[in-house]
C-alpha cells in the first residue's frame, strides 16, 4: 500500500475518499473544445434566461456590492413566508438549494449515522452525506423512480435523513402526493424527510394537465411534521448563475440550519434577483408552458428513432441511447449540442437532455439523428 501523503494524514478518511461534483460542461468550455457554437441542453436551465425584472434588480445593486449583503436575507424570507403561508423563521435561503443539502447533512449526521435515498438520484446526496461522515443507503429503482416501500424498509435506528428528489433528477419521474402521504406514515420520529422540489414548477403544471396531485410538501410543514421542502430559483426562474435557493421546515430545525449557513452566503445580487423574479410570474410561466408543449414533441422525436424516453415531470428527458453515453455526448458536442451523459449515476448508456425552445429542440433532433446513424459507438 502506498504511504499516505503528508496532507492526506491530516484529512479524515471520509473526506479523503470523497468524490467531487462534476457539473455539465459550460458553453464556453464546450465551444473551446469543439470550436463550434454550442447550444447547452445539459444542466436543466431556463432557455429564456432570467426575468428582465431580475436583470434590472441585479443591475441596481451592483454599485453597492462594496457592502456586505443582508445576512438574514430578511426581505426574501418575508416574501417567501407570505407566498407559502408560513412563518419567516421557517424559511432559510441559501446559495442554491444544493448548499442547503450540505448544511442539512452536516447538522444531522455524524459517523455511524445514515441517510437513505434511491439509486440514480441527485448526485449531490452522496457527496453531502459522505462529507458529513455519514453513510448513504441507496435502494433500487422501481419503474425508473423511487420505491418508497423499499426506502421505508431500509430505515433503521441510525437513520436521520431521507432524501426524496421529487421529481427525480436525472430520471424525471415523480411520486404522487398520495404515495408520499402513505410513505410518511411509515417514517419514525427520529428521521427527517427532505422533499427536494427543485423541479416543482414544471411538475405542478404537468400534474394539473394529467389530473394528478403532485405534492403536499408545504402542508406537511404547516402541520409541523419532520419534513423540509427545498426549492430553487435556478430552474423556472432562470437564475442558476447567481445561486439562490431555500428550504422551508420546522422553526427549530431551520434555526439550526441557519446557524450552519456560511456568513453572508446569499449575495446582494442573488437576493435582489430572487425578489424580483418572484414579482414576474409571467416570465416563469413562459418557461413552464414552453416546457409542457415541447416535452412531448421532443420525446416523440427521440422515440421515433427507436430510443426509450422516460415520461417526464420536469424540464429534461432521460433517454437510453443504447450506446456509450460519453461518446454520444462527445459527438453531439462536436455537432454543437451539449447534453449530460449519465455514467456517474450508474447509467453508462443513458443521457439527459434539457428541454429547450422549439428551435433548439429541432436542432437537437437533427443532430441526434445524424450522430446515432453513424457506426456504433460502443
Identify the residue ranges that each predicted region occupies.
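PLP-dependent aminotransferase-like
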Residues: 107-164
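PLP-dependent aminotransferase class I/II
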Residues: 51, 72, 226-310
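Active-site pre-lysine segment of PLP-dependent enzymes
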Residues: 130, 148-158, 170-193, 197-236
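Short acidic capping loops at alpha-helix termini that bridge into adjacent secondary structure
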Residues: 87-91, 112-114, 158, 190, ...
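N-terminal "arm"/small-domain region of PLP-dependent enzymes with the aminotransferase-like
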Residues: 2-67
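Conserved PLP-binding catalytic core of the aspartate aminotransferase-like
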Residues: 141, 292, 301-335, 351
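Phosphate-binding glycine-rich loop
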Residues: 69-114
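PLP-dependent enzyme catalytic core of the Aspartate aminotransferase-like
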Residues: 331-335, 340, 344-378
Amino acid at each position: 500500500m502506498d504511504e499516505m501523503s503528508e496532507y492526506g494524514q491530516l484529512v479524515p478518511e471520509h473526506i479523503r475518499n470523497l468524490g467531487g461534483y462534476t457539473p455539465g460542461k459550460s458553453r464556453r468550455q464546450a465551444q473551446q473544445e469543439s470550436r463550434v457554437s454550442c447550444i447547452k441542453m445539459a444542466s436543466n436551465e431556463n432557455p429564456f434566461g432570467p426575468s428582465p425584472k431580475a436583470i434590472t434588480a441585479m443591475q441596481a445593486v451592483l454599485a453597492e456590492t462594496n457592502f456586505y449583503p443582508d445576512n438574514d436575507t430578511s426581505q426574501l424570507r418575508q416574501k417567501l413566508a407570505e407566498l407559502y403561508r408560513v412563518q419567516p423563521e421557517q424559511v432559510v435561503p441559501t446559495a442554491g438549494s444544493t448548499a442547503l443539502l450540505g448544511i442539512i447533512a452536516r447538522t444531522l449526521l455524524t459517523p455511524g449515522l445514515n441517510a437513505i435515498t434511491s439509486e440514480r438520484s441527485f448526485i449531490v446526496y452522496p457527496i453531502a452525506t459522505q462529507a458529513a461522515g455519514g453513510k448513504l443507503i441507496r435502494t433500487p429503482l422501481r419503474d425508473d423512480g423511487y420505491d418508497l416501500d423499499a426506502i421505508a424498509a431500509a430505515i433503521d435506528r441510525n437513520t436521520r435523513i431521507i432524501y426524496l428528489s421529487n421529481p427525480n433528477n436525472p430520471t424525471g419521474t415523480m411520486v404522487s402526493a398520495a404515495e408520499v402521504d402513505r410513505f410518511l406514515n411509515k417514517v419514525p420520529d427520529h428521521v427527517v424527510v427532505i422533499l427536494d422540489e427543485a423541479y416543482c414548477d414544471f411538475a405542478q403544471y404537468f400534474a394539473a394537465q394529467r389530473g394528478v396531485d403532485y405534492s403536499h410538501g408545504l402542508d406537511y410543514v404547516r402541520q409541523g411534521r419532520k419534513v423540509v421542502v427545498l426549492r430553487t430559483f435556478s430552474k423556472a426562474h432562470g437564475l442558476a448563475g447567481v445561486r439562490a435557493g431555500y428550504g422551508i421546515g420546522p422553526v427549530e430545525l431551520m434555526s439550526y440550519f441557519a446557524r450552519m449557513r456560511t456568513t453572508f452566503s446569499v449575495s446582494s445580487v442573488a437576493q435582489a434577483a430572487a425578489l424580483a423574479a418572484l414579482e414576474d410570474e409571467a416570465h416563469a410561466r413562459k418557461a413552464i408552458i414552453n416546457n409542457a408543449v415541447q416535452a412531448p414533441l421532443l420525446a416523440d422525436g427521440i422515440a421515433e428513432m427507436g430510443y426509450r424516453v422516460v415520461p417526464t415531470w420536469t424540464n429534461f428527458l432521460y433517454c437510453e441511447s443504447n450506446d456509450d453515453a460519453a461518446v454520444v455526448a462527445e459527438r453531439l458536442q462536436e455537432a454543437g449540442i451539449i447534453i449530460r451523459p449519465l455514467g456517474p449515476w450508474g447509467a453508462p448508456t443513458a443521457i439527459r437532455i434539457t428541454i429547450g425552445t422549439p428551435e433548439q429542440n429541432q436542432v437537437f433532433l437533427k443532430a441526434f439523428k445524424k450522430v446515432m446513424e453513424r457506426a456504433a459507438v460502443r
